[in-house]
Amino acid sequence: MAPQLLLCLILTFLWSLPEAESNVFLKSKVANRFLQRTKRANSLVEEFKSGNIERECIEERCSKEEAREVFEDDEKTETFWNVYVDGDQCSSNPCHYRGICKDGIGSYTCTCLSGYEGKNCERVLYKSCRVDNGNCWHFCKSVQNDIQCSCAEGYLLGEDGHSCVAGGNFSCGRNIKTRNKREASLPDFVQSHNATLLKKSDNPSPDIRIVNGMDCKLGECPWQAALVDDKKGVFCGGTILSPIYVLTAAHCINETETISVVVGEIDRSRAETGPLLSVDKVYVHKKFVPPKKSQEFYEKFDLVSYDYDIAIIQMKTPIQFSENVVPACLPTADFANQVLMKQDFGIVSGFGGIFERGPNSKTLKVLKVPYVDRHTCMLSSNFPITPTMFCAGYDTLPQDACQGDSGGPHITAYRDTHFITGIVSWGEGCARKGRYGIYTKLSKFIPWIKRIMRQKLPSTESSTGRL
């Protein structure tokens, strides 16, 4: 019986082999349900490590939340995600005129520089000198629908068509000396606690002044000239325009019989003062009416007094330029009116009185004074402010020019170049509350100045003329 049972079991086994073989491999549809690739689980160490962008989002597809865990910063996550999803839309640099591109999902955004607009910053909003000076470093001129930049004498127009590059070591308007961080910078001049305010006078002073300024460092005011005579020493200031021309106030010319010029000095008390430079000729504006120094003048102070207060001194021999002796740049009238005089501050300097009716300073003083709008200027003065004048100074701070500073420079800096914008002319006392310094408005006289500077080289004879 046993052999028969064994045979039966063998036959049953052999009969079942084909069915078993057919079930060893599952159909693909069924197999895929079991053989799907699952995301690799982080190990315990990985869970405590900071995110890794290569592991999370490059080796494997990640979600925005996972990317956020890596960067731990919303802005960085957004920047990465916009590129990760559909590539960098900014790779082709679609933004014109140096616009800044920001990638998005299926799009991008251009942030345009001032003066441009459009999806790609392709539209130019301005080609006008009245908007940011046309982006010109010095002078701007409107030409049809475009602008044209040019530079002050001694400068070359840069390859970008906007910047100005100094053509020499002593190009105009460049001061070599700058204040370090431990020194007060010109914009940070503050009120002196021991300011002396003397008895006020109702008379205008033709000899304006610098009160509570700071010592001008060597090379910081290189365009400063001082007018001196044999008896009074420094009696007025001036501005170097070129090797042979110095700008000053017309009323300074009548102060003395003899005039010499000193340049490059900051301390008159030192024994080794600079040489006295001889004057060849003086040009006084023909419309200037010298004030009568009498009580009758001070009571009336008629309209023409101190109007056209400008003169040019021609030297016998050229001024030698150096790091401490450099001319100020002469602006165009439009540039002075539309750009320079719309700045916050101008810079005045001189050897004038340290307080009202006080002695002149032995050291060159410098002060930054804010421009004052014309309406406020006219309301503040007891005397006429003509179109050839402008105001600058402080309403309440005791800082101003003073006696002996007349004829000196009012300078305005623009893009690190210093331009002459005015001449110290007159004022009602020194640093009085509610009173400002009055300056000759240089933009009114650019053609007159250029006409004189086109004159021939100095002759050997001295003379005084009116033009």
Swiss-Prot record:
Ranges of residues in domain Gla: 41-86
Name this protein carries in UniProt: Venom prothrombin activator pseutarin-C catalytic subunit
EC number(s) on file: 3.4.21.6
PTM info: Gamma-carboxyglutamate residues are formed by vitamin K dependent carboxylation. These residues are essential for the binding of calcium.
Family from the record: Belongs to the peptidase S1 family. Snake venom subfamily.
Catalysis performed (reactions): Selective cleavage of Arg-|-Thr and then Arg-|-Ile bonds in prothrombin to form thrombin
Highest rank taxon of the organism: Eukaryota
Keyword Manganese: no
InterPro entries: Coagulation_fac-like_Gla_dom, EGF-like_Ca-bd_dom, EGF-like_dom, EGF-type_Asp/Asn_hydroxyl_site, EGF_Ca-bd_CS, GLA-like_dom_SF, GLA_domain, Growth_fac_rcpt_cys_sf
Compartment list: Secreted
Subunit structure: Heterodimer of a light and a heavy chains; disulfide-linked. Is associated with pseutarin-C non-catalytic subunit (AC Q7SZN0) in a non-covalent manner.
Disulfide bonds, paired cysteine numbers: C57-C62, C90-C101, C95-C110, C112-C121, C129-C140, C136-C149, C151-C164, C172-C329, C216-C221, C236-C252, C377-C391, C402-C430
Other remarks on this protein: Is classified in the group C of snake venom prothrombin activators, since it does not require the mammalian factor Va for the cleavage of prothrombin as the venom contains its own non-catalytic factor Va-like molecule.
